[in-house]
């Protein structure tokens, strides 16, 4: 039974004065809970919801819950995959209140005391709230009735499911591959290596990996299998591209001089100039910064192959250290540090000054708080225009407006994004314009290094701006090269430990929730001290920040990318939700150990399946994409790298109406859909026209055949008419009267004057029938039947045989000269003229015949 619908809106029940003081929203929320609603259901009585995915099970269900952000009542459900909020009555999913469990960063129980209660009351009533903070920039608050166990049930369900102790407790393992099967990513990595080496026609296979026959090479580089068992470097892929002149033994020696064994290897090579983009971790120069490795220096020097000019000069090498210089020096205490340009031939060391993972995590948290405080759907249920004494953007206090803008700047997120963009653009320019090689590293070479290298690849190679290439880029520079997705996302690893502190997911962070004066936290665990949480927490939105950088490039170069901003948002949602296994664990080695590709569904197959339904008109496809317009490197100037908030991601929860910033893109997509429909209609019309033309041609051919047959029949008819006229003249020359039968057939009756006794034909009835003779009932002294007979019938005619044997007018070779010979040919085309000679004796002659003869 659904909860009764409210008659009063939360925002309408309070006075304007209460809103001005900033406490009206909470008092409004309290009024609604005076209505009675059923308590949460037990697990055994859950409804069969249509919104559930494959293998998704309902664990906890609570009715009569309010989503404070939008003032909506409904049902809150905890499944083994999501926290789902369904609208009251219709049971439609409310997107803001529905969040995958893995996307939840933290949640906490909140208590709000009712300020409208009488002062003399002994006990002030309070209401129960649950705050949920997501990694996808949302902060939502759910309200529960007091004196019920709904909030406790939901809270305990989240507590059990948001932090699984084992990797295989994640929903992706329960669901399995389903219809989104995943091939082994090692095969795809080798195919990308083959493309980089100019061996794109070769295709990798698992048999090739098993027997080690994938070690191909070109003039400068080769694929090395020294790490095939992940012993040399557990966080590197099984195959590496290294200089062809470096042996496997030297590769192993060089790995000992780099942090975590992450030696310099090739990530991308220019197909024409030979310049490369390489990556590694920091060198282990020691406390005195005087440690060196001849093998490492040789390996780095081989990255600078000779230029293709006449002077055979060696190209320059840039060593790009992503860290601030002071951070690099601080790592000396732990044996790390940075290279000295004096030790590496023709090299230059450059520091980019990008902050560490902790700075990025705190920056995104501040940005999320800013958006929640100044968005249109706030987590305390009020509009940003009604906060802080009632000032508004249109006519409020300018100092307050400036303060809010300053808060956005204080978050530092856009500054960090610009740092990554600027560093990547600088790297791409060195490779494209100077034909120089660049070696990029940070401390461990898997966070800032992955950002810079992958973004520089995107700028340099148009292939990576397609759907297929973008997948290959992420699988190469993020997954294969060991970005620790489990630690950065707070998910369990192969060993079963989670990368986030045990208590962090259960507590409210300071400043993340704008609490009114009477609001208190009732979490079961005390929040950890800032120092301890900062040291232990390895979560950081590194990959999210890189996707943000890609969206900035997409904004600057709308014609250069095959995919759209909506594709990037869906990609991020899939990564954060852990619905698929592609981004599990911390390295390729761990994913191979668990068998992720066989046990879990594939994110890339899922996204491709979404696009297949609509083709190029799908929202993931960029309608402006023009591959010929940007078929080379993208080299943005520094002035163009000023980033902005990414509306489709940053504003979609706090400012839903403003998140649809791509109106032009949407209109273009609509026009593209219409054009596609018209194109299909045109193709259909052309197809029908071709079919009609074929039918017309066929009918024309039949008509021509009919005309030929008609012409032939007409010719035969004329010929027969001439022959008939000749026969008529021949008969009339005997002085006989010719009479045609009225039947219209080929039989012609010739009659003379009547006699008393009719004569019978000399032929028997059967003979007369065979030659077409018809006996008429009309009595006459002579009856002659004329019919047209076939040649085979004529051949059996005895008169014909007589004609053939006795005719004196035939040629020497036996040919007949009729009608030129002037004979009455019996076996001619006039065969069938049969005479009754007995009747001929009694033939009557017209009297006028003799008069004519005498006159002549």
Predicted ranges, named:
Residues 55, 62, 320, 326, ...:
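Functionally constrained cores in energy, signaling, and assembly domains
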Residues 461:
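Conserved hydrolase catalytic core segment
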Residues 278, 431, 436-458, 550:
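A phosphate-binding catalytic loop at a beta-strand-loop-alpha-helix junction
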Residues 2-78:
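Anionic N-terminal interaction surfaces
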Residues 50-129, 133-135, 139-145:
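Phosphoinositide-binding peripheral membrane targeting modules
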Residues 2-7, 15-18, 69, 97, ...:
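Conserved N-terminal structural segment that caps and organizes enzyme catalytic cores in eukaryotes
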Residues 76-77, 133, 269-271, 432:
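Well-ordered beta-strand positions
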